[in-house]
Amino acid sequence: WIVGTNRQPPLLHESVDIIICMFGFVSREGFNKILKPGGVIILLDPGDEHLKQLREIIYPVVNKQDTADSKNIEMEGFTLLHSEKLLFNEKLTSNEQVNHLLIMTPHFYRASKEGRDAACQLSELDITVDVNFNVLQKQTS
């Protein structure tokens, strides 16, 4: 597990079999450099409905999510092996759960103080989890 820049990952060239990029920024050049031929990238990106209920509370206007479809998953030098969507609803049943969810998202830092305060006062919240999975394989030549 490494947290670092995707543009210049601190790893040797062609030394990685699998990259999992969760809600991150895709760097074709950086990933291509460190991934072995035939290696795999697993991309997890939020769908349009991901945490929509939370976003409706903390933002005055809810913008459409930047989904995997709009990121042009097809990358030169890679083959798309599989795409799948995970969509389900979950109920947070305590103030602590709502606060933990908010803190673990970038929304905590993007929302206004008023938006954060509104969410932090909730004792429960129905949320939608909407995640797009895409598996790409580096071409061998």
Language-model features, listed with the residues they occupy:
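Conserved Class I S-adenosyl-L-methionine
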Residues: 86-141
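Conserved SAM/SAH-binding loop
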Residues: 4-8, 24-25
